């Protein structure tokens, strides 16, 4: 399926838009996961068995029944098996549409969002709306693992190249958690930079850290959505390194009041939503 499919041409990304102030669920726009999975050959059978797109929404406001503005922060878990992912700008516009709309309480807003996102994604979605006080107590966290970024290597190419992972393993069997803060890709539609921290947890033949870092850096001028990049990394690692167990998790920096943090694994449970230094 070509990326010039009508489902991408109609997206609000990159287009001049008006901001609605009254609740409007029709602002949400789906992107079929098959657009990317077809190219990876995983439309029917994914190599990961656990996963979600974990969103944090920082800019949520509505009016209570007396017209007093309310604010909250939301944790949203969009199941990897949903038919669609949610296009981020449409999600922002949708959230903005709550601003001048009255709701009875937190629960009414949470249930409304969950219902609308399930309908758009065509799959399971969990929404947890939190008072700001909950986040006041939240610490800046870091992802556990060895950082592979401080290597004295020369980089001359920034074009995506999965072949950096060719012959990337030794015969030594290990369990490793690896972290890189150098993940950068570009939005598929607008070419805006997307900055992320990548976490890889695997059991299997030891992966060469230099080859892995060169592979991660090769995303630097690559155009794909966050969710698609993580699934591509998972598939490439399974193809070249063939680990027995694998988790790929990326936490991207915030844009438009939203951060997107895709998690894919074949052995680990979903993590709690946390916050890194760059988020």
Curated annotation (Swiss-Prot):
Gene3D superfamilies to which the protein is assigned, alphabetical: 3.30.1130.10
InterPro entries in alphabetical order: GTP-CH-I_C/QueF, NADPH_dep_7-cyano-7-deazaG_red, QueF, QueF_N, QueF_type2
Pathway(s) of this molecule: tRNA modification; tRNA-queuosine biosynthesis
Record-annotated active site: 187 (thioimide intermediate), 194 (proton donor)
NCBIfam families with a match to the protein in the record: QueF
Quaternary structure and partners: Homodimer.
UniProt protein name: NADPH-dependent 7-cyano-7-deazaguanine reductase
Organism: Haemophilus influenzae (strain 86-028NP)
Designated gene of the protein: queF
